[in-house]
Design a protein with these regions (language model features):
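Generic ordered-secondary-structure signal
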Residues: 12, 65, 104, 131-134, ...
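Alpha-helix initiation and N-capping motif
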Residues: 101-105, 172, 198
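Extended repeat-based scaffolds of very large eukaryotic assembly and lipid-transport proteins
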Residues: 1-137, 153, 157
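Core register positions within helices of long alpha-helical scaffolds
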Residues: 78, 127, 163-166, 193
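Generic helix N-cap/helix-start motif at coil->alpha-helix transitions
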Residues: 83-87, 115-123, 140, 151-159, ...
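Alpha-solenoid HEAT/Armadillo-like helical repeat scaffolds in large eukaryotic proteins
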Residues: 107-115, 143-153, 163, 174-182, ...
Length: 206
């Protein structure tokens, strides 16, 4: 079962993710709170990991130059041991937005819908972010809804919001939707990006 399928099958009628873990971590003795690893890296002042970003960038460029199953598998497997929040900043700083062509977009779509691991899905969100989340929202409404839906699972809320910010897109309707259906780290990150009247309202939402 893919991550996308798993998340969709565990959303209740209010859009809340009802499972406590994901299918790639089903047998963990102590499941980590969803979104906690990225939150730890991004909120504790941990330095980004440019080495990981460089490795991913080289593998992505190798795939874009030669889009074969072998090259795609190398990138897919490398992502397994990574943490999104560790590499996202140096990765987008180093990546030329012109590299996000139709091959990169198709790769992002493939990883998003077919990956059985969370980190590959987050990487797909980042590629979509470089392509332009606002553009996707306007031109690919079905894909946009799928991206927003997976962000209802708090493991992916940060990656979704971060990918919107890559091109300064601040979709308030989507952000308020996420606030209503999250309660942990996903809610914290959504409140950070929402437009509030003042800090008092922001604290009240928390």
């Amino acid at each position: 079962q893919t991550i996308y399928q798993y998340v969709n099958s565990h959303l209740d009628e209010h859009g809340r993710f009802t499972a406590t873990n994901l299918c790639d971590d089903r047998y963990a003795t102590i499941p980590r709170p969803l979104g906690s690893e990225d939150a730890f890296h991004y909120t504790m002042g941990n330095l980004p990991n440019p080495k990981s970003a460089s490795v991913l960038l080289k593998l992505l460029q190798a795939y874009l130059n030669e889009p074969t199953t072998q090259q795609r598998s190398k990138l897919y497997n490398e992502l397994k041991g990574m943490a999104f929040a560790e590499y996202c900043d140096p990765f987008i700083e180093a990546l030329d937005q012109n590299d996000i062509n139709s091959v990169a977009f198709d790769l992002a779509r493939r990883f998003f819908y077919n990956a059985d691991g969370r980190e590959q899905v987050k990487f797909a969100l980042l590629l979509f972010g470089m392509y332009g989340m606002e553009k996707i929202c306007q031109q690919e409404p079905e894909l946009w809804q799928d991206l927003l839906r997976i962000a209802h699972c708090e493991e992916f809320t940060f990656a979704f919001l971060y990918s919107c910010r890559v091109t300064n897109f601040n979709p308030q309707n989507a952000i308020w939707e996420l606030i209503r259906c999250t309660s942990g780290w996903g809610k914290v990150f959504s409140i950070t990006d929402c437009h509030c009247r003042d800090e008092e309202e922001r604290l009240w939402l928390l």
